[in-house]
């Protein structure tokens, strides 16, 4: 059968989908990854070489439309300011939706400030040529099945317009379903439905729950990390993939001391262009003198701000795939993204998740020169969720560099590396919430049946 995969054109959104593409292609199906052509973004979040990232994985890429700025940066569009998140709107909805608890506010903030912004960027009120071309490709190629991720639901419109079966594929906790259900339960128009309406109408597609949430949802989120929603999902094992590269020779050598990885996210460093929080200097000072070997995946921007010299036990590398690094590690220090945390979980590596009590909100103000951004915190939007998930199960710890001293951070590192109870908890968590779920390859027959039934 023909399978079309669509996603927001950034590595962090594509990489989680690669194992599905491999499984389907290995079963003899024709798989294409279809996405907008890249365009340089002031925030750095869009990959201008996205098609190359796709083909590096061994999957055929289809780039659609001319390079076009995100709606939020399209100053030639008089309505571009309407796409921007703003404080008045978010607080109005927080009150209307009765979002009170800290964990619920975190869910709302990720949905409103990031997920719905991504959706609005590619589905503004005015049609976009790149998105129209994706729909046109689907109508012409006639896929049997479309896989799409929640930050790029125009894949669902392409599926409906072409008559294909379609499956929503989660790449992070299900904030869109949680928020959509919250709106519906309060009798309010769904923000997700409103964002989808212009594109759906443009292509003659009805906005309903199936369009918004898929005919089915593949869910790689461990049971203990899932958000409270009523949307049924099909559990699937998350298989980490983080790009193609040549394996470094030093990775083949057995570490002489416990190896600790520090990984703070490729998307985060693309956006932040450095470290304004003091987190990196605190981590490097804490590991200095410990009897460990540290591999820090930090680039020159992240090191140049506040780091004069690296400790003797630290090797800084711009990039190394976690799938190659983690099997050699005794601990992983990370920023709390789902992909990084589950990569660590898949190798039963004890973890320390960097998290603070700050909110994660992003506001934009239109100016004559473009957009002036105000970001309350550079932390990962759901780092509190992932940190608590690991800490509550004994497989890791939560690190708040704003409140914990260097001595406390150093003690935390020692415990995570040396305590066999933490390693045992990580092994148990791997078996119970990762290894027990079916792989993408095992779900191919189910996907084939779904596509056949339409």
Describe each model-derived feature in a short phrase.
Residues 407-454:
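C-terminal amphipathic helix plus adjacent low-complexity
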Residues 98-106, 110-197:
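Conserved nucleotide-sugar donor-interacting segment of glycosyltransferase catalytic cores
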Residues 236-331:
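Donor-nucleotide binding loops and adjacent catalytic segments primarily
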Residues 36-39, 46-48, 150-153, 220-225, ...:
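Short, polar loop motifs at secondary-structure junctions
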Residues 41-43, 190-268, 299-300:
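A nucleotide-sugar donor-handling region in carbohydrate enzymes
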Residues 21, 317-386:
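A donor-sugar binding/catalytic signature common to diverse glycosyltransferases
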Residues 1-68:
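N-terminal subdomain of nucleotide-sugar transferases
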Residues 39-110:
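Conserved nucleotide-sugar phosphate-binding/catalytic loop shared by glycosyltransferases and other
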């Amino acid at each position: 059968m023909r399978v079309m995969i669509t996603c927001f054109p950034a590595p962090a959104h594509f990489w989680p989908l690669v194992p599905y593409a491999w499984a389907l292609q290995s079963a003899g199906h024709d798989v294409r990854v279809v996405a907008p052509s890249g365009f340089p973004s002031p925030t750095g979040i869009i990959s201008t070489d996205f098609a190359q990232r796709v083909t590096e994985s061994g999957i055929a890429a289809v780039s659609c439309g001319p390079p076009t700025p995100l709606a939020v940066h399209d100053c030639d569009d008089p309505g571009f300011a309407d796409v921007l998140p703003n404080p008045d709107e978010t607080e109005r909805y927080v009150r209307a939706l009765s979002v009170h608890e800290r964990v619920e506010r975190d869910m709302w903030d990720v949905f409103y400030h990031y997920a719905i912004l991504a959706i609005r960027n590619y589905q503004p009120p005015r049609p976009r040529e790149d998105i129209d071309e994706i729909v046109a490709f689907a109508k012409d190629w006639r896929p049997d099945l479309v896989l799409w991720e929640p930050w790029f639901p125009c894949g669902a419109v392409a599926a409906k317009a072409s008559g294909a079966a379609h499956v929503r594929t989660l790449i992070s906790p299900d904030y869109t379903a949680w928020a959509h259900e919250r709106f519906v339960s309060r009798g309010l128009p769904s923000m997700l439905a409103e964002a989808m309406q212009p594109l759906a109408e443009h292509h003659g597609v009805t906005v309903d729950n199936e369009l918004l949430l898929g005919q089915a949802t593949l869910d790689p989120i461990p049971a203990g990390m899932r958000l409270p929603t009523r949307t049924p999902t099909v559990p699937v094992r998350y298989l980490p993939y983080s790009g193609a590269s040549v394996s470094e020779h030093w990775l083949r050598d057995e570490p002489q001391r416990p190896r600790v990885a520090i990984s703070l996210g490729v998307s985060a460093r693309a956006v932040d262009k450095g470290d304004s929080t003091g987190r990196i200097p605190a981590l490097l000072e804490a590991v200095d003198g410990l009897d460990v070997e540290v591999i820090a995946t930090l680039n020159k921007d992240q090191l140049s701000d506040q780091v004069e010299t690296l400790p003797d036990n630290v090797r800084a590398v711009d990039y190394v795939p976690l799938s190659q690094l983690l099997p050699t590690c005794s601990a992983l220090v990370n920023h709390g993204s789902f992909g990084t945390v589950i990569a660590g979980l898949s190798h039963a590596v004890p973890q320390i998740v960097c998290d603070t009590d700050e909110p994660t909100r992003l506001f934009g103000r239109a100016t004559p020169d473009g957009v002036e951004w105000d970001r309350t915190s550079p932390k990962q939007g759901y780092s509190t969720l992932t940190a608590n998930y690991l800490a509550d199960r004994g497989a890791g710890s939560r690190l708040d560099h704003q409140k914990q001293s260097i001595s406390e951070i150093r003690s935390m590192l020692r415990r995570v590396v040396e305590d066999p109870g933490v390693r045992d908890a990580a092994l148990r968590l791997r078996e119970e919430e990762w290894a027990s779920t079916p792989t993408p390859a095992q779900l191919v027959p189910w996907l084939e049946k779904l596509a056949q039934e339409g």
